Amino acid sequence: MLGPSQHPPAPPVVLPTLAEVIGPARREHHETVVDATQWCHAQGRPIDPDLIALICAAVAQRDRDDPDLWTRERVSELLSCDVRNWCSMARCWHPDSQREALWLFLGFLAATDRLDPASHPLDRLRDVLRCAGLGDDGRPRPEGMPDFRCECHRPYCGPTQGEVSAGLE
């Protein structure tokens, strides 16, 4: 029996999984989700299509003039803010494997010429993910490996993706 100042415990909050809420985004970005998922599989790195849909939805949610223009700052914002905000607004769990999915998605964009030529080169975009704990293979960095020097918010003055692709670097 509860005393006069005691209240019964609140029921636990149960958040839906990403799979339970991502359906509309998968439909909206169907072509990109299918193409990226197939590309990842062909690279020997199968990926959950829901993670690709989440990236696409988070990019689309932010008002951007050019969704194909990628910079280190944009990758950092997507990873640290946009994906988390999308999950918060959808009231679902934020997936732990988003860094690896973004690594693969950026590779897909570069390999299929879907990066704006003015984008930072793929390796510089992936620096943000190295800073966030991935190794050079796009998988979590093993324990004991040195941290990656963060330059996510420093101005980038090197060649663009277009210059790298054209061999003009």
Residue positions per predicted region:
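Acidic, proline/glycine-rich low-complexity IDRs
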Residues: 1-6, 114-169
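Long, charge-dense low-complexity segments
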Residues: 2-29, 34, 38-41, 90-94, ...
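Glutamate identity and glutamate-enriched acidic tracts
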Residues: 20, 28-31, 73, 77, ...
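N-terminal core-binding DNA-recognition domain of tyrosine recombinases/integrases
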Residues: 21, 34-137
